[in-house]
Swiss-Prot record:
Lysosomal membrane chaperone required to export cobalamin (vitamin B12) from the lysosome to the cytosol, allowing its conversion to cofactors. Targets ABCD4 transporter from the endoplasmic reticulum to the lysosome. Then forms a complex with lysosomal ABCD4 and cytoplasmic MMACHC to transport cobalamin across the lysosomal membrane. May play a role in mediating and regulating the internalization of the insulin receptor. The keyword Cell membrane applies. Glycans are attached at residues 75, 85, 168, 345, 445-446, 455. Residues 1-7, 69-98, 164-186, 325-362, 428-484 are extracellular. One of its GO terms (cellular component) is clathrin-coated endocytic vesicle. The gene is lmbrd1. The chain crosses the membrane at residues 8-28, 48-68, 99-119, 143-163, 187-207, 304-324, 363-383, 407-427, 485-505. InterPro entries: LMBD1_LysCbl_Transport, LMBR1-like_membr_prot. Keywords: Cell membrane, Cobalamin, Cobalt, Endoplasmic reticulum, Glycoprotein, Lysosome, Membrane, Transmembrane, Transmembrane helix, Transport. This is Lysosomal cobalamin transport escort protein LMBD1. It holds the Pfam family LMBR1. It is found in: Endoplasmic reticulum membrane; Lysosome membrane; Cell membrane. GO terms for biological process: insulin receptor internalization; protein localization to lysosome. One of its GO terms (molecular function) is cobalamin binding.
Length: 537
């Protein structure tokens, strides 16, 4: 038991180190994109905290898998310290408490704290009222989110997971079953339903941003950016052309005649365009003479290598996701079970790799962290390229050192939801690994063998799957949270197909696009000249 406790302690210590690394990453990440002129302490802390909570929750996944796998020997028997079922339940409950705590904090952030901070700064920008009036208005709008959260918790608590299978079951029987469900783990069901609903939104965000970013990020690294010198020459020609057009319009009023409304409107547009072109010229001049630009030329081969590596990883994910979904389509128990599969019929690369890495702790920890960070970076690439949209309305643009507090909160909210969906994405890629880790069990073969003594049954060592006996294999708490309601799993299944389609479309679009400007995102028509100070302090 002492050895087991020591190794369990090591697992939790690595989780603690990862927690500190997550906090450091979130701080650097948020500070990189927030506007230094409009930065606010509360919005910064909120963005860092919400993103960190999501990443910490995803970091519990390998701990959960490690604990259930560590309980068993390679020969399929439980270790001495884990033979007692109460001990196993106690260990798993520590993970369950962790999930309860973190998921509750996520609900608090999504439905109360982030909306409140967002609406507070919206009111601050729109009105010059007192702090009390701003807080009152923010609370009024936030109450709608609290109402939605309450409804989700109630639906999750009261929605029965099963219905009587008998044809002659009365409505009274169904109501009795409903209250029986309420009496057992209704808190878990309520929290699971709420988190699954958020994960569903995260799935839509992943389809929109992550799938596109997985193709856009590597191809942008491979193609590189335009040459600053030649881009500046083209911009100088555009400046001369616009200046000539401005002079032509102004020449019409040299004799004292006023300009027509059409000419005044055209002159205003040309002057705005000229202002933008001159700002663009200043930025191009800065990049042309900057030492960092010259260093980037030296680093160009490394960027190409990273781009090739990223596109190979993306293809590995897509192929694994396709094979996993195809396996569910051909061999699952059907849509009413959430497309659950018994065993693995079509193997995919990640489903083979993860159980192998899991035997050498903490290789799977590192791999899961890498997958999560990969999703973060590709999602960020998709958001940066597309901006934050609400249907056909573009709400915010995400730019380095230019992102407003409200946009930063939106950004971290989207990333939080995408990270929540990452756990299900990993399950889609390696369902056996997420459910049981590397657990094995001894299965008694029904066929008998004749021996000198008599007939005897053969014991076969098998990997744990959904058809395994409950007393022989321990299911991870992650799986219980993700698959408490079968209809969410069915929606995720179809969402995976949509993810694959969007990735292919994004890959084609990214291949057809040309190189990006060296000052991409630095100059926009709605920027002021003062915003240059943020780029060139």
């Amino acid at each position: 038991m002492a050895t087991g406790s020591t190794e369990l302690l090591i697992g939790w210590c690595i989780f603690g180190v990862l927690l500190l690394a997550i906090l450091a990453f979130c701080w650097v990440y948020v500070r990189k994109y927030q506007s230094h002129q409009e930065s606010e302490v509360i919005s910064t802390i909120t963005a860092i905290s919400s993103l960190a909570i999501a990443l910490i929750t995803s970091a519990l996944l390998p701990v959960d898998i490690f604990l259930v796998s560590f309980m068993k020997n390679h020969n399929g028997t439980f270790k001495d310290w884990a033979e007692n079922n109460d001990t196993r339940i106690q260990i798993e409950n520590t993970v369950l408490i962790g999930y309860y705590t973190l998921y509750s904090i996520i609900l608090f952030c999504v439905f109360l704290w982030i909306p409140f901070v967002y609406f507070y700064y919206e009111e601050k920008d729109d009105t010059d009222g007192s702090h009390c009036s701003q807080i009152g208005s923010a609370l009024k709008y936030t109450s709608g989110f609290v109402l939605v959260c309450s409804c989700l918790l109630l639906i999750g608590a009261f929605a029965p997971l099963d219905i009587p299978s008998k044809a002659n079951a009365t409505e009274l029987d169904k109501i009795k079953l409903l209250f029986q469900n309420l009496g057992s783990s209704n808190g878990l069901a309520a929290l699971s339903f709420s988190i699954s609903s958020l994960t569903l939104i995260g799935m839509l965000a992943a389809i929109t941003y992550t799938a596109y970013g997985m193709s856009a990020l590597p191809l942008n690294l491979i193609k590189g950016k335009r040459n600053a010198h030649y881009e500046r020459l083209e911009n100088s020609e555009d400046i001369e052309e616009v200046e000539q057009q401005v002079e032509n319009i102004k020449s019409k009023c040299k004799d004292g005649r006023p300009l027509s409304s059409k000419d005044r409107q055209a002159l205003y547009k040309l002057q705005e365009k000229l202002r933008t072109l001159k700002r663009k010229d200043r930025h191009l001049e800065h990049h042309e003479n900057n030492c960092w630009t010259k260093c980037c030329l030296v680093m160009r081969p490394f960027k190409i290598v990273w781009g090739i590596l990223f596109i190979l990883v993306a293809l590995l994910f897509i192929v694994s996701l396709f094979l996993s979904n195809l396996d569910k389509a051909l061999h699952s128990a059907g849509i009413n079970t959430g497309f659950i599969i018994f065993g693995t019929n079509l193997t995919n690369p990640l489903n083979i790799l993860l159980p192998v890495l899991q035997t050498v702790f903490p290789l799977d920890y590192i791999f899961i962290t890498t997958i999560t960070m990969y999703f973060i970076f590709t999602s960020m690439a998709g958001i940066r390229n597309m901006g934050i949209w609400f249907f056909w309305i573009r709400l915010y643009k995400i730019r380095r050192r230019r992102t407003r507090p409200q946009a930063l909160l939106f950004l971290c909210m989207i990333l939080l939801l995408i990270v929540l969906h990452t756990s299900y994405m990993i399950y889609s890629l390696a369902p056996q690994y997420v459910m049981y880790g590397s657990q094995k069990y001894l299965w008694e073969n029904n066929s008998t063998q004749e021996t000198a003594i008599g007939n005897s049954s053969a014991l076969v060592l098998k990997d744990c799957d959904a058809s395994a006996p409950e007393d022989q294999c321990t299911v991870t708490r992650t799986y219980l949270f993700l698959h408490k309601f079968w209809f969410f799993s069915s929606i995720y299944y179809f969402g995976n197909w949509a993810f694959i389609v969007v990735f292919v479309i994004g890959l084609i679009v990214s291949c057809c696009k040309g190189k990006k400007s060296v000052i991409e995102g630095e100059v926009e028509d709605d920027d002021s000249d003062l915003s240059d100070d943020e780029d060139h302090p």
